[in-house]
Regions:
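Acyl-thioester C-C bond-transforming condensing/cleaving domain
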Residues: 2-5, 13-58, 71-76, 82-197
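Structural signature of FAD isoalloxazine-binding scaffolds in flavoprotein oxidoreductases
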Residues: 8
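Short, internal active-site loops enriched in acidic
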Residues: 67-69
Length: 197
């Protein structure tokens, strides 16, 4: 079993407010609203490999996570981000979710793989674009069949669900993930500047 596991280097994409939010200066967010989480993950993986002088061919495993699956290829997002970063298709790639802790869990999972001797080099991290969170119409499968639009004059009686809010709101405490992290920062005295560093 490996005793020493190190993070060689890292890269991150710009941090932007989601499309429905406001930036610190009061202007609307959404600067990266048209860039998928997978593309952002690909960019971060390429950057980390370049900064650490590591060839994509030397990667033994890719582990990427996110809170919400917000684009059409998101179910296997790690694979698409890894392939986009030119990691060979033979390399196993794992997508996971631990809500806001997904990126950190990816690093923990990658470290465990190395410690157990399953891999020597693991790319691990998170990717997200909440501006692309879909709206969901629950019950539509029962009402309308796939590829058949509603008939003229029919009313949609299903409630529209905002996937962003329903998935990031903790039903037990009634708070959103961001509110929870803000509260923890207040209690621990962590500033926004320290958080972003």
């Amino acid at each position: 079993m490996a005793e020493d596991v190190v993070i060689v280097n890292g890269a991150r994409t710009p941090f932007c407010e989601w499309q429905g939010g406001k930036r610190g200066d009061g202007n609307p967010g959404g600067l990266l609203k048209d860039v998928s989480a997978i593309k952002l993950g690909e960019i971060a993986i390429k950057g980390a490999l370049e900064k650490s002088n590591t060839s994509p061919k030397d990667v033994d495993h890719v582990v990427m996570g996110y809170a919400l699956q917000t684009c059409d290829q998101a179910i296997f997002g790690a694979r698409h981000a890894g392939l986009g970063a030119e990691i060979p298709q033979e390399v196993p790639m794992l997508t996971l979710s631990r809500i806001c802790g997904s990126g950190v869990q990816s690093i923990v999972t990658g470290a465990q793989m190395i410690m157990l001797g399953e891999a020597n080099t693991v790319v691990a991290g998170g990717m997200e674009n909440l501006s692309q969170a879909p709206h969901v119409l629950r019950g539509m499968r029962d009402t309308y069949k796939l590829a058949r639009p509603p008939k003229a004059g029919t009313e949609l009686e299903k409630d529209m669900e905002d996937y962003l809010f329903t998935n990031l709101l903790d039903g037990f405490c009634g708070s959103f993930m961001a509110q929870t992290s803000d509260e923890i920062c207040k209690r621990k005295g962590v500033t926004r500047e320290e958080t972003d560093a």
